[in-house]
Amino acid sequence: MPVDKNLRDLEPGIHTDLEGRLTYGGYLRLDQLLSAQQPLSEPAHHDEMLFIIQHQTSELWLKLLAHELRAAIVHLQHDEVWQCRKVLARSKQVLRQLTEQWSVLETLTPSEYMGFRDVLGPSSGFQSLQYRYIEFLLGNKNPQVLQVFAYDPQGRARLREVLEAPSLYEEFLRYLARFGHAIPQQYHARDWTVAHVADDTLRPVFERIYENTDRYWREYALCEDLVDVETQFQLWRFRHMRTVMRVIGFKRGTGGSSGVGFLQQALALTFFPELFDVRTSVGVDSRPPQGAADTQG
């Protein structure tokens, strides 16, 4: 149907009798969603709306990311490789969306932010329960974080539940063990509240996979999916740190942290260290025995 006079007529089949029926706004509860932006500055600072929406939309994407990562764990528990890869693919796209969102907040100038920063009090993104939940799902376990949520017993209980359960990576290692890979016994059952750190005893497992990709294609593909997730997560962390640096410089954070310096430390935290370390030894014909010192300087 051609458009005449820059006007598009409604088609006969379009529903207009919506009284008492499910609508777009009703399904999405837009009345609640769009009334949740309540600036605290008086008079309301124009740019506080940007700040609120930036963080609210981030929390929505984090909710979806947690949903997908939980599904990935369940799929691994049931050896459902392709279903796991599907939700990991979506997780990567969510992380890209979260990363690109920082470009919107970067339009906030230092003076604009300082115009309403005082109303934030001690509130801080560090207190994002969903962010900590996702870090725990991915393996960055830190029981100290629970202290931050002492004011929220229900939220703290949610965090404790995921703290005490195997992470995505630990479920992946258990999956590998079920399919005949020589995963050390401690990864079958251990204190899951302790963060995973790089372990040289796992390197032979991943050398075998990466040097025999035709034979272990499913395992290799999952490894690369996890590498993609960590890489994108670190890009998000980096953009966060750079955005904070751009807006507030090296001021302390509202939550009491050192600000940029504290965010920089997060860039050294890893989820799946062996999947990066293995690349150093892949294809090397002669490797020193495990634990041998490097004498080549």
Swiss-Prot record:
Q: Which terms does the UniProt entry file under GO BP?
A: L-tryptophan catabolic process to acetyl-CoA; L-tryptophan catabolic process to kynurenine
Q: Which cofactor does it need?
A: heme
Q: Which free-text remark accompanies the cofactor? A: Binds 1 heme group per subunit.
Q: Which UniProt keywords apply?
A: Dioxygenase, Heme, Iron, Metal-binding, Oxidoreductase, Tryptophan catabolism
Annotated residues that bind substrate are located at 51-55, 113, 117, 254
- Binding partners and assembly: Homotetramer.
The protein in question is named Tryptophan 2,3-dioxygenase
